[in-house]
């Protein structure tokens, strides 16, 4: 048996070092030149804890978004002085000292709108700005207007926005796409990264890194000028995700970076804090208390890191799918995250070349090639025949098939034969009458069966098309669009997630009621409508009968549901 060349790990380590050392200073500079706003649990200390534990509001996010009417230190001092007095009323104290978030206005669409007309009419309804942000507001100011998901949310979210922007582009709103890219670039320049959302309590983590793909989308309209303009911010974001890599030894992890024993560099999700999330304070405390065998701080970090993944929550992160307290997000190397990092490296190479820096472009290409090899080596389950996450504790690829397995196809990082196997696995295990299942496990969590989410439908559709698997790709689009149309026909809204075991039903689970709006569903629906309908005959609703495609000779109806575990 051939033994591995001893110099290979060192060589792999040296390749990125020159880039990471060049750009590490960029993220540090952003942190040093801005005063990072403190989240409400730090600003208000025991008052915040007491209000959340008292459950004064049905949604823990309400008080996390409340705006102090004066200096929080003064409010806290008043609270300490008054709290033990006879007749003290905590709710009254909160009402006097805080301005609570306003309920979002319920949008009643005009009657008789088609699906496309409904979505186009929603864009201005979902547009917000931070022009009137108060001094002590947890809402982080942004220079341009932005589109929120809808429903419960008053802030913009990172990875949601990419799929929303796909829809904005389809609707011809390139000005809004440009505004949102500018906002995210502003956050990178100000905070060193793009937070989960523009709230102070989201600053300790990011979300799936789609910024480079946003810039690439904008470049479809503005050309290479967009790539050159936002190259510095893309480099800063890359430095954030790779922060600490220059000092990593084989087998170690630091924040978001993982260095395996052979020197392979991959990434994981990570939150810099290990306390309950302000927006889910009581729930996180209860989850930690339910497992006394683990340190509470460890559970808090893994809960927060799962929120950073966008998949909050899923059996994907758990040892026991029925027990949230067994999640261990930080010891899992996700296949979707590393696919996005590969794509970021490829776009950085393209942008560097556009800027005339061929040497730097070659460096990023080298990093992308190394990561692609790492994905193929560590994130492919040969026994099962699909891509999966890598477990840092067992030092093995995990067995569970999830919709995240389609990300290597989405970014063109998959080997052709493996993409073909993924198509088979997708059709056999994940495709349902109402779209693509997130997993095949029923845990009660929202990122599990029977829920399907718009971004994952689009990633799968695009990924499979990239490898010539048009039939499965079109099956996913048709099934999901049918679900969206049936729900819209009944409820006159698009929702955050769908039950894909059938059609016409919104999804369940999660930490809050089902939301309507809905940014990323709007965007993906428009993209899929244009995919299934001929360009010469664009459709405003999902056709009653599936249009013929290259791979079909007659209209197809959705298949019957496959039993889930």
From Swiss-Prot:
Active site: 312 (proton donor/acceptor), 496 (proton donor/acceptor)
Signal peptide: 1-30
Region feature Disordered, mapped onto this chain: 539-565
GO molecular function: alpha,alpha-trehalase activity
InterPro entries attached to this UniProt entry: 6-hairpin_glycosidase_sf, 6hp_glycosidase-like_sf, Glyco_hydro_37, Glyco_hydro_37_CS, Trehalase_periplasmic
Subunit description: Monomer.
The enzyme's E.C. designation: 3.2.1.28
Top-rank lineage group of the source organism: Bacteria
UniProt KW keywords: Glycosidase, Hydrolase, Periplasm, Signal
Function of the protein: Provides the cells with the ability to utilize trehalose at high osmolarity by splitting it into glucose molecules that can subsequently be taken up by the phosphotransferase-mediated uptake system.
Reaction(s) this enzyme catalyzes, per UniProt: alpha,alpha-trehalose + H2O = alpha-D-glucose + beta-D-glucose
GO-annotated biological processes: cellular hyperosmotic response; trehalose catabolic process
Residues that, per the record, bind substrate: 152, 159-160, 196, 205-207, 277-279, 310, 511
Lineage, uppermost ranks: Bacteria, Pseudomonadati, Pseudomonadota, Gammaproteobacteria, Enterobacterales
Protein's cellular compartments: Periplasm
Similarity comment: Belongs to the glycosyl hydrolase 37 family.
S-adenosyl-L-methionine found in the keyword field: no
SUPFAM superfamilies: Six-hairpin glycosidases
Gene Ontology terms: cellular component: periplasmic space
Disulfide cross-links: none
Identification of the protein by name: Periplasmic trehalase
């Amino acid at each position: 048996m051939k033994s591995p060349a001893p110099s290979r790990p060192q060589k792999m380590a040296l390749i990125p070092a020159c880039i990471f050392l060049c750009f590490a200073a960029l993220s540090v500079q952003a942190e040093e030149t801005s005063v990072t706003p403190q989240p409400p649990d730090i600003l208000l200390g025991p008052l915040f804890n007491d209000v959340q534990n008292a459950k004064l509001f049905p949604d823990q996010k309400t008080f996390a978004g409340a705006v102090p009417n004066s200096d929080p230190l003064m409010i806290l001092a008043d609270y300490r002085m008054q709290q033990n007095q006879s007749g003290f009323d905590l709710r009254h104290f909160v009402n006097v000292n805080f301005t609570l978030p306003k309920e979002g206005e319920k949008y009643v669409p005009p009657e008789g709108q088609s699906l496309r007309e409904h979505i186009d009419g929603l864009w201005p309804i979902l547009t917000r700005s931070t022009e009137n942000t108060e001094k002590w507001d947890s809402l982080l100011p942004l220079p341009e207007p932005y589109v929120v998901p809808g429903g419960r949310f008053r802030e913009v979210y990172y990875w949601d926005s990419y799929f929303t922007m796909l829809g904005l582009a389809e609707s011809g709103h390139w000005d809004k796409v440009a505004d949102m890219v500018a906002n995210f670039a502003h956050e990178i320049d100000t905070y060193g990264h793009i937070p989960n959302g523009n709230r102070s309590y989201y600053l300790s983590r990011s979300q799936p890194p789609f910024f480079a793909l946003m810039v690439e989308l904008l470049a479809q309209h503005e050309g290479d000028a967009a790539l050159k303009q936002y190259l510095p911010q893309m480099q800063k974001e890359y430095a954030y995700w790779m922060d600490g890599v220059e000092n990593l030894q084989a087998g170690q992890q630091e924040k978001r970076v993982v260095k395996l024993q052979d020197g392979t560099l991959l990434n994981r999700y990570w939150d810099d804090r290990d306390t309950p999330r302000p927006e889910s304070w009581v729930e996180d405390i209860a989850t930690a208390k339910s497992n006394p065998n683990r340190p509470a701080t460890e559970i808090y970090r893994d809960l927060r890191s799962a929120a950073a993944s966008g998949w909050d929550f899923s059996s994907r992160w758990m040892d026991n799918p029925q027990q949230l307290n067994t999640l261990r997000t930080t010891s899992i190397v996700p296949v979707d995250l590393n696919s996005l990092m590969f794509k970021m490296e490829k776009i950085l190479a393209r942008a560097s070349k556009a800027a005339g820096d061929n040497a730097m472009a070659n460096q990023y290409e080298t990093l992308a090639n190394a990561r692609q090899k790492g994905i193929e080596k560590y994130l492919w389950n040969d026994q099962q025949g699909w891509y999966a996450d890598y477990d840092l504790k067992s030092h093995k690829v995990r067995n569970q098939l999830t919709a995240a397995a389609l990300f290597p196809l989405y970014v063109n990082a998959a080997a052709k034969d493996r993409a073909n196997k993924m198509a088979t696995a997708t059709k056999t295990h994940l495709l349902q009458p109402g779209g693509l299942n997130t997993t095949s496990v029923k845990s009660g969590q929202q990122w599990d069966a029977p829920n399907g989410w718009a971004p994952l439908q689009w990633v799968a559709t695009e990924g499979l098309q990239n490898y010539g698997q048009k039939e499965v790709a079109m099956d996913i689009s048709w099934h999901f669009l049918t679900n969206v149309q049936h729900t819209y026909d009944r409820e006159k809204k698009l929702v955050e997630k769908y039950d894909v075991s059938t059609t016409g039903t919104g999804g369940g689970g999660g930490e809050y009621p089902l939301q309507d709006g809905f940014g990323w569903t709007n965007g993906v629906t428009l993209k899929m409508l244009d995919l299934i309908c001929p360009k010469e005959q664009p459709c405003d609703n999902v056709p009653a009968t599936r249009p013929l495609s290259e791979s079909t000779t007659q209209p197809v109806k959705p298949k019957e549901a496959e039993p889930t575990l």
